[in-house]
UniProtKB/Swiss-Prot annotation:
Source organism of the structure: Saccharophagus degradans (strain 2-40 / ATCC 43961 / DSM 17024)
Modified residues (N6-carboxylysine): 217
Higher taxonomy: Bacteria, Pseudomonadati, Pseudomonadota, Gammaproteobacteria, Cellvibrionales
Parts forming coiled coils: none
Family per record: Belongs to the metallo-dependent hydrolases superfamily. Urease alpha subunit family.
GO biological process: urea catabolic process
Protein name in the entry: Urease subunit alpha
Length: 568
């Protein structure tokens, strides 16, 4: 039997079982757990390669073959780290397994035919597109920025650079919701809009959900009182939608205990649960210990560095319409930025007590940095805390990698009722797929696939004789244009909105998908991130303890996935 060295094999077909891959320039390594391909029967496209007529390509017609196959990719998802061929059919993931020609090859589960396109995944990491569940829709250019970073679903609220949107993630009222749904059809991005949830009576909230909101947002700038919390959650229970909350920093209408009591055990997504982005000072972080609370972070505090505190004070003054000449406004800002709780947030992510990471786009957050800041946090925690218990003795960081990737894929999908469509690499889901060269993992995708069509990619000079000459930068591809754009992305709304035929009312062309199971999801469902510690915060020193353990760490002075990759 002929043999090939591991190095030569990896260079040709990508890593296989037992091989380790470094994630960008971090201290994180993942190890291949399983290989669905068959040694000696791998398929690869190119001159003199396997996928040719009568060889790796069969005569099967399109009813038996996928539209696209991604060959020999290393899948990194919450459920595993495996090598496989991935098939896409009608915009969805149709199979994960072994591609080829069953007429001459054994073990084929994905038949390649003359109607099949090929994307080379050899040596690349394949992940699900990120879900950013904390978006201020301040400008449409955010969507392109997010897409080019690897985000394929954006959930939040807003109407553009209105003063309300600059501070809060709410799209208030039927007219605004309709306009945002109409505008959204121009983008290769799944979108969902949160209505304004701040009201003590249900009428206005019912209207917004029936008009196309996928959920509701409670924000302190609109008055997040116990009465509005209770009413909003009551409405959400009736419509099976999620509620996101930014709690009362000033403790004007109650303390964190009053807010938790107002939840009455009902599920809620707490934004920036550490508190720098807003929330009961100094102890909103306690909320992560509740079984009905789905806690997330926003990315400016990820991870804790020597620059974090200084940067936040300036951001806060702008985003919340504060005046540095008014002492009360300055005191408000100072109360929200606490190095002790930000440091604890790092550790709570590593323990799996904080379940999600999002951006808070242009409103104390960077829309294109959800992914890289998640992995920077994972790196910092490995350097400072060592291997997780689940990774001890394995020589790799597989469990930590699964924990962190879940924070921006499957967990926000579960939290907002969209996991039946997006959030993981699983058969039947939308083919929202990101490919990464390992050296650029989490920083610069090599290909962004949206609903089965290539929507964006780094591309060279269009007038060059080959695709690679400079200037190479991210450009929209065919999947981001025309009807293809509308047919490869979806808008998430409530079931009540679909029942009300808003597609006809607003003359929408792209598919509307109802969110579901929003009210039954709990912290226990947060994949690899379900820890519910007993939380304590010292009101004077701001020291944070989880199950009696003091949570503290030093700020990072240097991070990976940073200036090495970016000129600006």
């Amino acid at each position: 039997m002929s043999k090939i060295s591991r190095r030569a094999y990896a260079d040709m077909y990508g890593p296989t079982v037992g091989d380790k891959v470094r994630l960008a320039d971090t201290a994180l390594w993942i190890q291949v757990e399983k290989d669905f391909t068959i040694y000696g029967e791998e398929v690869k496209f190119g001159g003199g390669k396997v996928i040719r007529d009568g060889m790796g390509q069969s005569q099967a017609t399109s009813d038996k073959t996928p539209d696209t196959v991604i060959t020999n990719a290393l899948i990194l998802d919450h459920w595993g780290i495996v090598k496989a061929d991935v098939a896409i059919k009608n915009g969805r993931i149709s199979a994960i397994g072994k591609a080829g020609n069953p007429d001459i090859q054994p073990g084929v589960t994905i038949i390649v035919g003359p109607c099949t396109e090929v994307i080379a995944g050899e040596g690349q990491i394949l992940t699900a597109g990120a879900i950013d569940s904390h978006i201020h829709f301040i400008c449409p250019q955010q969507i392109d920025e997010a897409l080019m970073s690897g985000t394929t679903t954006m959930i939040g609220g807003g109407t553009g650079p209105a003063t309300g949107t600059n501070a809060t993630t709410c799209t208030p009222g039927k007219w605004h919701i309709g306009k945002m749904l109409q505008a959204g059809e121009s983008f290769a991005m799944n979108l969902g809009f949160l209505g304004k949830g701040n009201a003590s009576l249900p009428g206005g909230l019912n209207e917004q959900l029936e008009a196309g909101a996928l959920g509701l947002k409670l924000h302190e700038d609109w008055g997040t009182t116990p009465a509005s919390i209770d009413n909003c959650l009551t409405v959400a229970e009736n419509y099976d939608v999620q509620v996101a909350i930014h709690t009362d920093t000033l403790n004007e209408s109650g303390f964190v205990e009053d807010t938790l009591a107002a939840f009455k055990g009902r599920t809620i997504h707490t934004y920036h649960t550490e508190g720098a982005g807003g929330g009961h000072a100094p102890d909103i972080i306690k909320a992560c210990g509740s079984s009905n609370v789905l806690p997330s972070s926003t990315n400016p505090t990820r991870p804790y560095t020597v620059n974090t505190v200084d940067e936040h004070l300036d951001m806060l003054m702008v985003c919340h319409h504060l005046d540095p000449n008014i002492p009360e406004d300055v005191a408000f800002a100072d109360s929200r930025i606490r190095k002790e709780t930000i440091a604890a947030e790092d550790i709570l992510h590593d323990l799996g007590a904080f379940s999600m990471i999002a951006s808070d786009s242009q409103a104390m957050g960077r829309v294109g940095e959800v992914i890289c800041r998640t992995w920077q946090t994972a790196h910092k925690m490995k350097v400072q805390r060592g291997l997780l218990p689940e990774d001890e003795g394995t020589g790799a960081d597989n469990f930590r990698a699964k924990r962190y990737i879940a924070k921006y894929t499957i967990n926000p999908a579960l939290a907002h009722g969209v996991a039946h469509e997006v959030g993981s690499i699983e058969v039947g889901k939308l083919a929202d797929i990101i490919l990464w060269k390992p050296a650029f993992f989490g920083v610069k995708p090599s290909l962004i696939i949206k609903g089965g069509a290539i929507a964006a990619a780094p591309m060279g000079d269009p007038n060059a004789s080959i695709p690679t000459p400079q200037p190479v930068h991210y450009r929209k591809m065919f999947g981001a244009y025309g009807q293809a754009c509308k047919q490869t992305s979806v808008s998430f709304v409530s079931q009540a909105a679909i029942d009300a035929s808003i597609s006809d009312y607003f003359q929408l062309e792209r598919r509307l998908v109802a969110v579901k199971n929003c009210r039954s999801v709990t912290k226990a469902d947060m994949v690899h991130n379900a820890y519910q510690p007993h939380m304590e915060v010292d009101p004077e020193t701001y020291e944070v303890r989880a199950d009696g353990q003091l949570l503290t760490c030093e700020p990072a002075e240097e991070l990976p996935m940073a200036q090495r990759y970016f000129l600006f």
